Amino acid sequence: MTMIESFVKDRNEALFSLDRRKIEAYLVKYGEGETAKAPDMLFWASVYKAICGINGAPKDVLEKAHTWLSRNGFSIPS
């Protein structure tokens, strides 16, 4: 497995889990420790926006992302 494939696998497993602890561990592993410490609203907005940008994201996870972003006043990336 290449480094890119490993990164994508880790990213998808973390983000699609919607488990904050798992996502925080992924962020710290890849040098985004500050994002892991973000307040809830900013953290989840970042997570859901990132999910919207992933080709092949599971439909149910993508729908949760769209719903959360809409309910919290954020735009949905196209």
Residue map of PLM features:
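N-terminal acidic leader/helix
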Residues: 2-42, 46-49
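Repeat-associated, polar segments at repeat-unit boundaries in modular proteins
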Residues: 68-69
